[in-house]
A protein has these predicted regions:
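Generic detection of intrinsically disordered/low-complexity segments and helix-coil linkers/edges
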Residues: 12-16, 20, 28, 32-34, ...
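Short, low-complexity intrinsically disordered segments
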Residues: 20, 36-38, 91, 167, ...
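Extended ligand-binding clefts on enzyme/binding-domain cores
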Residues: 138, 148-233
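Helix-terminus loop motifs that line ligand-binding clefts
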Residues: 54-141, 145, 152-173
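Long hydrophobic alpha-helices with heptad-repeat/coiled-coil character
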Residues: 6-14, 22-33, 119, 130-151
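Solvent-exposed loop and edge beta-strand segments that line ligand/cofactor-binding
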Residues: 25-43, 47-51, 88-113, 230-233
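Intrinsic disorder/low-complexity segments enriched in polar/charged and small flexible residues
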Residues: 24, 40-42, 71, 95, ...
Length: 233
């Protein structure tokens, strides 16, 4: 009985956090430090929502899919224009310079692990309204297909079934020390080097991670030291 009460309390607390961070369109990972929409954060969040709020789960994923690029890329980050002090912001990524970038959303130019099909399946399996869930799957199917086609086409040029990452943030293990030696072996031109806005000063509540900026369309071989993760099954 005591264990069940503890579990119920944890569930209530988790729901309270999600409710507090819900914007009406997506869930902020952290209202102060991370106020925008992150790709796989939203997928995991939708998996949680689908167990008690089907509409919110589908809205979370729909908002992310609305920012999908024309070439199928599902961005790691969708910016909320109400929060302009976050770094690196849209002016760092210059995503709008790509003809494939979405027209109505500012995004980053990198991706995160593709768990979105799993999230969509969870939404269907736990749906209270099956008809609505099927409508959502019909909407999401083409989005997910384009997303995975992008990964196979752009990130597996040798057809090995191994999708490579272009940036540590794409792995989901952003701050892992496994990247330290790899990043030290990269040599960038001056126009590719990390830049920091002159007016940007980190506070105790806003600590910027080290950033490496690549060109808009870097060409790395699959033998690159960053070629890792996601083997096709």
């Amino acid at each position: 009985m005591a264990q069940r009460m503890k579990e119920d309390m944890l569930v209530r607390q988790a729901k309270a956090v999600l409710d507090f961070n819900w914007t009406g369109e997506y869930t902020m990972p952290g209202p102060r430090l991370y106020p925008h929409q992150w790709s796989w954060d939203s997928a995991f969040t939708a998996i949680g929502y689908c167990r008690y709020d089907q509409d919110r789960a589908t809205r979370e994923l729909r908002h992310l899919f609305e920012a999908q690029w024309k070439n199928g890329l599902l961005p790691q980050l969708v910016f909320n224009p109400q929060y302009t002090s976050y770094f690196p912001g849209p002016n760092f990524w210059h995503a709008k310079e790509s003809p494939d970038a979405p027209e109505h959303h500012e995004t980053s130019g990198v991706v995160q692990p593709p768990i979105h099909a799993t999230a969509a399946l969870y939404v269907y399996r736990h749906a209270e309204d099956e008809a609505k869930a099927k409508d959502f799957l019909e909407y999401a199917y083409s989005k997910l297909g384009a997303w995975h086609d992008y990964l196979y086409r752009e990130r597996d040029p040798e057809g090995e079934g191994l999708v490579y990452v272009r940036h540590p943030w794409e792995s989901g293990m952003d701050n892992s020390p496994i990247w330290d030696q790899i990043m030290q072996r990269l040599h960038l031109r001056s126009d590719q080097a990390a830049t920091t806005a002159p007016t940007y000063t980190p506070s105790p509540l806003r600590i910027a991670r080290p950033v490496v900026r690549t060109t808009a369309s870097p060409t790395w071989s699959n033998s690159s030291p960053t070629a890792t993760t996601m083997r096709r099954r």
